[in-house]
Amino acid sequence: MEYRQLPHGNETEKFGVLGLGFGGIGTTPVDEIEAIVRKAIDHGINFFDMCTAGATYAPVGRAIAGRREQVFLQVHFGAVYDENGEYGWCRDFDTIQKTFLWELEQLGTDYVDFGFLHCVDEDEDFDKLIEIGVLDYLKELKAQGIVRHIGFSSHTPSVANRIIDTGLIDMMMFSINPAYDFEKGDEYGIGSVKERFDLFRRCETEGVGISVMKPFFAGQLLSAEHSPFGQALTHNQCLQYAIDRPGVLVAVPGVQTMEHLDQVLKFLEATDEEKDYSVIGTFTADTITGTCVYCNHCQPCPAGIDIGLVNKYYDLALAGDDIAANHYTKLGVKADACLQCGHCEERCPFSVKQMSRMVAIDEYFAKR
């Protein structure tokens, strides 16, 4: 396992490049959750993202008992849980505070390594977190040593840059995979794709670490049928791709079962040839014509829709990502605001029929 140093951390804060995410593990038997965490630690994994169902915290706490100093926990302020332990998105200070204290208790610890502003995708959302006092709360917790580092998760480069501008951030969680980073070529080398790489370079330069979510695009890149490229990549290729991006310290693929963990652990023994992802250089715009790759070349939308983000949440929801579906419901402007003006379709380099997509997206979420 390769370990990378947190730029703004002390010399002991080194993460294995392979971590774990628990977004879909909430329905897994608690004994299996404990076994997964223990086996992961035994194999050198020491970074765990705790955006997950409430039922996950206690078994994780039991698994790390006696080994707390060996692991790093990334906890999200704004991810909360209902009476059944199901994940929810929240912007109420009292609920966020209560949830965090409960998480500490369940985990059996008196501190977390990273306290994250959770899923901040719009400027108005960041404004809200400041307004209700969550950012100040994180600063207080850091001063007390209860939160070691402040970070955030986002899907939006412009918002991410604004949060980094505060000077408070040591870690950012961002989705990175070949599908999200695809662009047609020099003619279209502007907008969202360039913004993403500029953001990653900024993080590298300023010492903000990146933890990577969605390295497999919710599993879609692993299937020729579902991949936007029409060709399957492997777990090893996707993980190496994410780890090679500027500023990245750790990739956190989601696991739900011991079999999932075993598959991910194969990365540690994979050869350079097995990790080689140069095949993506052969993918062309024709390969993905008709598929939204969230490049946002269609922007600005006259109705104010973030078309790339709306499509991303929709595709992830279709792939079974309930957290992404929940995030969609919190957007300030959703698919139902579409004016059917065709502006986006005129600008789309991939010939995506976004007007009909907006109708389908609205209908899909209305039925959930």
Feature map (PLM): residue ranges:
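A cross-family glycoside hydrolase active-site/sugar-binding cleft signature
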Residues: G21-G23, D49-C51, Q74-H76, G115-H118, ...
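Glycine/proline-rich, positively charged
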Residues: D31, D42, Y87-S211
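N-terminal binding-site loop/beta-alpha segment at the start of enzyme catalytic domains
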Residues: M1-V75, D110, A143
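Structured C-terminal cap/extension of enzyme domains
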Residues: D42, N46, D198-R368
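N-terminal small/glycine-rich loop or linker at the start of catalytic domains
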Residues: P7-I25, Q74-Y87, F116-C119, F216-L221
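Conserved, mostly hydrophobic/aromatic
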Residues: L6, L20, F48, V60, ...
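Active-site mouth loops of central-metabolism enzymes
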Residues: G21-D31, Y81-T95, D123, S223-A232
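Short hydrophobic/aromatic-enriched beta-strand-loop microsegments
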Residues: Q70-V75, L168-N177, T271-S278
